[in-house]
Amino acid sequence: MNAPHTPHLNEAEAAAAVEANAAELGRRALTRREQKEAYENNKLFKRLVRQVGQAIGDYNMIEHGDKVMVCLSGGKDSYALLDILLRLRERAPIDFDIVAVNLDQKQPGFPEHVLPEYLTKIGVPFHIENQDTYSIVKRLVPEGKTTCSLCSRLRRGILYRVAGELGATKIALGHHRDDIVQTLLLNMFYGGKLKGMPPKLQSDDGKNIVIRPLAYAKETDLEKYAELREFPIIPCNLCGSQPNLKRAEMKALIRDWDKRFPGRVDNMFNALANVVPSHLMDARLFPFAGLRATGEADPNGDIAFDEDPCGTDASAPGGAKSVSIVQFDDL
């Protein structure tokens, strides 16, 4: 709405008129900087929603009638996961239910009121599972050693059980792109295997389907989103355990690469969805022993003496041909 033309007003009076007009509209006029921030924040929101929606569609993570159990730790990632899934559900062409679950492991200083108050406020069904795994871990793990591995195994088993009790058909975890690449590097550097963190898999007990809807999202975007949404973050080091130093090293490495070599981490992530078994060395994935020359050209055959061209624009996971069962209106 344009203000009426008043040629006799000086600059101060004109500014006052603009402020008064904004007040009449019930809000203060935004500065140019505020307008830019609002624009960037809106882009961030749309990007995250688009990435989560695409991941869900590419891997058929959520289907009609599903009951999705969102594992909520109180960290930025799980808050963002719940928030975005709730927004997507409003526009989804399918019906599915969401229940938030938190495992209270009785860590010293854990603010047990935070999550129930937050979830009640936003109107999301939730379940708090109280299990003193902290005492078990402290009893079994020597002082000074990281407790993360044992704690994770105990937590996983409990959450699988809770999913069955609640009738959940999918278990949603808050792992993102950076977590997936970190896991790939950890397995390569310390485990001697090409293994990442899949966006969808069957649990080791064979009874649950685990999904990671944030698989395409960058951690830096999730950090910014958590700040904008002002989630009541709960610290992740209440147990006093030493952090996983190897994973912290991979995280620092990825952050450094993202700054110094734009696109490198994206290409590493995309490589997980563009695997060529015939050009690796795993005989379980490709029948090297029985390979014979057929006399027919093979586009996937070895180019032998030529240098393999390195692409810098590897297509994203899912590719252009993927068909999403969940499509959302423009936001």
Curated annotation (Swiss-Prot):
UniProt keyword tRNA processing, yes or no: yes
Signal sequence, renumbered to the chain: none
Pathway(s) of this molecule: tRNA modification
Entry's localization field: Cytoplasm
InterPro entries listed in its UniProt record: Rossmann-like_a/b/a_fold, TilS/TtcA_N, tRNA_Cyd_32_2_STrfase
Binding positions ([4Fe-4S] cluster): 148, 151, 239
Enzyme class at the top of the EC tree: transferase
Coiled coil: none
Biological process per Gene Ontology, one example term: tRNA thio-modification
Free-text cofactor note: Binds 1 [4Fe-4S] cluster per subunit. The cluster is chelated by three Cys residues, the fourth Fe has a free coordination site that may bind a sulfur atom transferred from the persulfide of IscS.
Domain of life of the native organism: Bacteria
E.C. number(s) listed in UniProt: 2.8.1.-
UniProt short sequence motif PP-loop motif, positions renumbered to this chain: 73-78
Reactions it catalyzes: cytidine(32) in tRNA + S-sulfanyl-L-cysteinyl-[cysteine desulfurase] + AH2 + ATP = 2-thiocytidine(32) in tRNA + L-cysteinyl-[cysteine desulfurase] + A + AMP + diphosphate + H(+)
CC terms in the record's Gene Ontology section: cytoplasm
HAMAP family given in the database record: TtcA
Subunit structure and binding partners: Homodimer.
Protein purpose: Catalyzes the ATP-dependent 2-thiolation of cytidine in position 32 of tRNA, to form 2-thiocytidine (s(2)C32). The sulfur atoms are provided by the cysteine/cysteine desulfurase (IscS) system.
Record NCBIfam families: PRK10696.1
Other noteworthy facts: The thiolation reaction likely consists of two steps: a first activation step by ATP to form an adenylated intermediate of the target base of tRNA, and a second nucleophilic substitution step of the sulfur (S) atom supplied by the hydrosulfide attached to the Fe-S cluster.
Family affiliation: Belongs to the TtcA family.
Full protein name: tRNA-cytidine(32) 2-sulfurtransferase
